[in-house]
Amino acid sequence: MGIKYFFKWLKTNHSESIKCIDRHDNSQCIDVLLIDMNGIIHNSAQEVYGYGSFSFPKENACDKKVYSLVCRQIDRMVIQFKPKELILCIDGVAPRSKQIQQRQRRFLAAHDRKKPGTEFNFDCNKGNTSKFDSNSISPGTEFMHNLGRYIDIHIKKKQKPAFTGRETTDAPQNNWRNKDQSWRQKVDDTAEWSNLTVVFANDKVSGEGEHKLLDYIRKYGNSYYTYCIYGSDADLIMLSMSALTTTAIKNIYVLRDEYKSPNYLLINIPNFVKNLIKDVKSNWTDKLDEKRFINDFIFMCFMVGNDFLPHIPSIEIMTNGIESMLAFYTKNKNYITDNNGLGEIFNYESLLPILKDLEGLEQSLCNEKVNNSEYFRDDLLESSSFLVTNEFGQQKCVNINEYREKYMKKHFESSSEASLMYLEGMQWVLSYYTLKVPDWEWSYKYDYAPNLTSIIEAMSFKQIGGTSKKEKNQYKLFPVNSVNSTEVATSSSGFQKSFSMVFQNSLQNTKDWRDKKTKTSSDAIPPFHQLLFILPPDSSDLLPYPLCEALTNELKIYAPKELIIDRAGKRQEWEGIVLLPKLDQKVVTECYLKYKPYVTEKKDLIRDIKGRTFKYQNGEVSFL
């Protein structure tokens, strides 16, 4: 999902950087086509099984039809854009901080699947109707293992013309895709595949698909090539912007499907960055360091939403969050991020005045929410408001200090712990998007973000009410000027230790931090281990026996009987926060170690291995 509403903001404010192209247009010169595969996989499953954007399933729907549709979509993009290199990446095991969000989504999917008309599955042999579990689109499942094999065979056949040939696809019924189906017709693509270099990272290669794509660009990027990344997540825009500052490439685009249309939308990232810089330069007195500004912009965008931290309550794109941050950024004229030679860090002394300016907007934003029926009711806002009379009649006005206090008391036992952990998370996200995974095991443990006041207090080294002497020495803060990002990349027991300053009892010297050496490097957990963490009991059959027993026995206590979704202050139902019991990772690890030795079938064991990236060239296959 990435940053909610960011693409809408981009279309509204920088439409000149977006071009609409139809599926017959092959005029766009692309040297390297990179595909974030999970979007194609989900769309294909929805089309075959008739859920999500599609009203009816295909006749005799089965997994093989999904695999075939995925490969046909790849074929058509190869034919249209004629790249020299094709990079295909499927989501592998994710960092712990992403697994928390994945767990929320999969419990929500299991909850929604109980509703009528969702995720149909027609048995190919018997014609019976059952449910298709979209949670099977997760690393380590039989569905994903078979898909990886299918794509592998498909690529090999394509590079050996004697084995090519495929069936045409059936047109879906009652769907917008009926408007133009000519782009789906079978064509001869032998020439396009014969000289094509293909790189394929399946679900056994750890890491999110989009980050594996960017890793490829960082390692093998060619400044003379034009790169195009296909996918719908706003993350891809941020990663592409980051590539302009961390690699030698100059031309990079993001391609995505146009909503309810057969066309594509092509985002010109260098053009977008150029116009963004132009807007800021007009209010910047000194010479603007463009690379630092790009990283600053990426950092600020993550404050309005990302997949690893809940967004700060009063900073939202739909309430001009990005515009406000840019205005305060140009007002203060201080760079937020810096590169110490080993990686990007953020300077809290530069960020602090921006947050203070944003804090000044909270009153009007809260008043807007409590008086606007477009938002779901927020009981905290309601209980903190009082009636006032003005020229518009009677309206509610929020006692902002009362609301801030109630918010923190409701959601956190210790506001200092939450604020400091959130700051750690901000550095984790910055490192993740500009370098690599800082720590696979780190995660933010709360469902909500602290409010701006609490974060500002923590950054100002003010003692927060209720903070004990023990807590002061336990929780950490980030360095001001430099940090060893190599240590971050190899952190194991604590990402906090690498980017930390212990709260001193006197709180006097804000630039005195302890740069602690880390002991061992953390790594991604095995796929079955992740499935135990993210799957609800209703999806236990996606794990082999006896691992599946853990979800319905030891781990069942962490699954709620009724799903609670907090939509307070949200505009849309899908924005709600899924509240789940906190899962004890030690218990999950114990279950994995307890049951894994009894998984003996080779077809199951192969799904739990750590894979390697394949390279296909001239009919030969090698490892990258």
From Swiss-Prot:
Entry keyword annotation includes Thylakoid: no
InterPro entries: 5_3_exoribonuclease, Xrn1_helical, Xrn1_N
GO process annotations (BP): nuclear-transcribed mRNA catabolic process
GO molecular function: 5'-3' RNA exonuclease activity; RNA binding
Region of interest (Disordered), residue spans: 161-180
Name this protein carries in UniProt: Putative exonuclease 012L
Top-rank taxon: Viruses
EC number assigned by the record: 3.1.11.-
Family per similarity comment: Belongs to the 5'-3' exonuclease family.
Keywords attached to this entry: Exonuclease, Hydrolase, Nuclease
Lineage: Viruses, Varidnaviria, Bamfordvirae, Nucleocytoviricota, Megaviricetes
Class in the EC hierarchy, top level: hydrolase
CDD domains: PIN_XRN1-2-like (cd18673)
